[in-house]
Amino acid sequence: MLDPTYPAFPIFAFLGIVCCLVPLPWHLQSWNSGTCFLMIWTAVACLNMFVNSIIWKDHAQNVAPVWCEISIRITLGASVGIPASSLCIVRRLYSIAKKFRAVMVDALICVLFPILYIILQIVVQGHRFNILENIGCFPAIINTPLTYPLTFMWPVLIGVISFIYSTLALIQFNRHRLQFTQFLHSNSTLSVSRYLRLMALAMTEMMCTTPMGVFVIILNAKATPVSPYVSWAVTHYGYGRIDQVPAIIWRSNRLLVASYELTRWSSPAIALIFFFYFGFAQEARRNYAAAWGWVRRAVGLPERVPSLPTTKKPFSSSDKGSGFAEKFAAKAKGLSSFNVKDFTSEFTSKAHDFTFKAKQYTLPRPMPQTPSSSGFSSSDSTRFGSSVDGKELPSPTTKEFSSPIPIHLSGMQTLASFDSNKDLPSPPAYDVEAQYGPYNIDNRVSYHIADAGVRASYPMGVAYSSDSEHRRIVPQHSTVPQHNTADEPASPALPDTPSSCSSSATFSTLQSRDFIVLPSTTDVTRGTGSLPTRRSPAGPPRLPSLSQLFGISSMTRERDVEAQVEDVATGTASPTTTAPAPASTTIAPASATMAPATTTTAPTTIANIQRGEPDVPASPRTHRASV
């Protein structure tokens, strides 16, 4: 009778052999003993079934008795060797630290235990073997009560133990995931990906072999009657006989067909599952490439297959891409003779011709000098070209702003009139502070510093930079270096445009989002007084409040300020509402045209200075210069 599974079964059995033997070398190098034993047992079982299916595909003659003696031992050993290998895999995953001891234990489980199992089968083996048509050699195990604990129980028991180990390993991996991952990364032979693939392989094998073992037990109990085990002599009477069973007989019993087919198809199925987990991994692809290189060199094949000719013409010197490459190379070659000095001088000359629109920038309202009861709308704003105190505010692009604050840009030391560090002195810096007064809005006081060369950083408010004809309004807690001397070089004329700057002892860096520097045109000799100063503290900088950072104040205080400014502008300030002006100091400029410094009689004391300090810290980006 022809085998309905022929030639499908021999093909899959051969594929199982290949799938198990191909990954074996690199698993041997990494000393994965459980995986190696699983591959060996599966490959041997597939080889056994492959040979049997080829030899006895259409008959049941005893043509290879010696092979049958070996074949039945392989079948018995593989029935427990494969589950035992799976047990070794999950046990190794549970305790992966002790490698040498694990290899020895795996060898005992996967080699010694199957050998003992094969020896014990002699107790329930009634004769030498059976030859089943289409299947081949098969063990002749009698169906007695002693057969179940000696033969059928072990695959199921090993599967249960493997399930317990795999559960414990998964719990341990989930509980100590971080430490486990670090340990796996330190292990050169076991990665997280391989760990998970091994666990998946072991669990898949358990889900296949354990239920199948239970099913085989049930089938054997129902397919043939269970005979009592009498004695050794009765069981082994006529031990030398060989039963030859045609396919038409054993295929007539569906339970026997299911039992035999499950037994022989299990090995190729496990081989394919193993290859599915490990045959497409990164190390497998790397070894495939190495093997192909060896075969290619042995056969003499070229390293790469020559590509077919295309209709596209190769690039020539007349192509657009080639011309672009030549132009780019010529320009790159010209960079070697690039003169930075000529470039910056040319840029400087062009920067002087750069202009802005007059009404593009908006100035904040000028701070009042004396309080007043009248005010103006909070929506009013002062722009370039408008007038304050009867004087028109010129555009920052006019020549009146002839002394801009020198600012330094990294990598652009010679750009326009941005002077280099050598052109700036390094005077000691002081904090400008004032006595607290009843009309100080948000603890802010305006000071008048008559010095055309003042260079300062302002953590809050606005500073005004101009020549000696105009005022510089310096908010409270601003860092103001000493005035320039006659020996200092004059800064080149450049329109004073809004810039962001941060201070240091030499004012040598430019940083964004710090301060705004804009011009002012108010008379510097008006309302000046003594200016108390003290050295910069060594403590950390302070952070501004939201109102100081964004220039926001309450509507009531804003209207009071507007009223005070209106009274000052119209000259109608009430003497009864005038508070004593805070102490201030006028720093005389180097120019002889400036008014002499005047001071008020208000005392300058530590208490007054501390009382005038704001409740919120200054900006953390303010770098105060130390002496």
Swiss-Prot record:
Q: What's this protein's name?
A: Pheromone B alpha 2 receptor
GO biological process terms, semicolon-separated: pheromone-dependent signal transduction involved in conjugation with cellular fusion
Low complexity bias (residue ranges): 372-387, 569-607
Say if the entry is tagged with keyword Membrane: yes
Q: Which residues form the signal peptide?
A: none
Q: Where in the cell is it found?
A: Cell membrane
Q: In this UniProt entry, which residues form the Extracellular topological domain(s)?
A: 1-7, 57-69, 124-150, 219-260
